[in-house]
Amino acid sequence: MKVLEINQLEKSFEDNKVLKGINLIADKGDVVSIIGSSGSGKSTMLRCINFLETPNKGVINVCGEVIDCSQANLDGPDKELQSQIITLRKKLGMVFQSFNLWSHMNILDNITEAPVHVLGKEKEVAEQEALKLLQQVGIEEKAYAYPAHLSGGQQQRAAIARALAINPEILLFDEPTSSLDPELVDEVLSVMRNLAEQGMTMLVVTHEMEFARKVSNKVIFLHDGLIEEEGHPDTVFTNPQSERCRNFLFNRRD
């Protein structure tokens, strides 16, 4: 079942056209790894999908919630459109490179903030669900600790639990291991592997080629704002058709 469809997505920052017509489909349970050099548009694409950045053109369909970015005044006062964007965002969980936990809240409060104040859940119910999520990511003992008292890996696992707390249809990961010390990377990737095994749909901007090859069922290679190569990881990694993709993977080999 298709849960995400992007057609001709474009994004510019002043005169710099970062996305030049992205087309992408993800089915339920897909793990899509998005690879490419810095500046290719990977993170911008993710941020446009959940409207952290405002696309200039294109159509985004998340589980039947369709927004035509070409015709809409996305930053305007249209209340119906803004409500539609909020509805779309509720279907998407986002995990950032820099964790983005609120430093003045303990981990439990970080996780329950959106369920209580956005979804309208009772605080007690949200806390019980949050504790289960912390157990799922292996840091239940950190529920009442503050982010500054956690390692980078623990903070990112807490951020994954926070993203899961809204029960999203799709998780978006923006280079989730890039800010971690090397010895902490595996604990985060392990959580992501478990989510993949449980059938969570994920789009992952990553430089972790082993994860992309072994966990994903689809890999896309971005270059200069366009998808230049896409397919099953076995094909992309062993027989890429794009010379740029071949060179990128050659330079990333272990």
PLM segments and residue spans:
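Conserved ABC ATPase signature
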Residues: 146-150, 154
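ABC ATPase "signature
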Residues: 230-231
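Helix N-cap at the start of a conserved alpha-helix in ABC-type nucleotide-binding domains
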Residues: 182-184
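Catalytic Walker B motif of ABC-type/P-loop ATPase nucleotide-binding domains
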Residues: 171-174
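Conserved ABC transporter NBD signature motif
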Residues: 58-72
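A short, proline-enriched helix->beta-strand linker immediately N-terminal to the Walker B motif
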Residues: 165-169
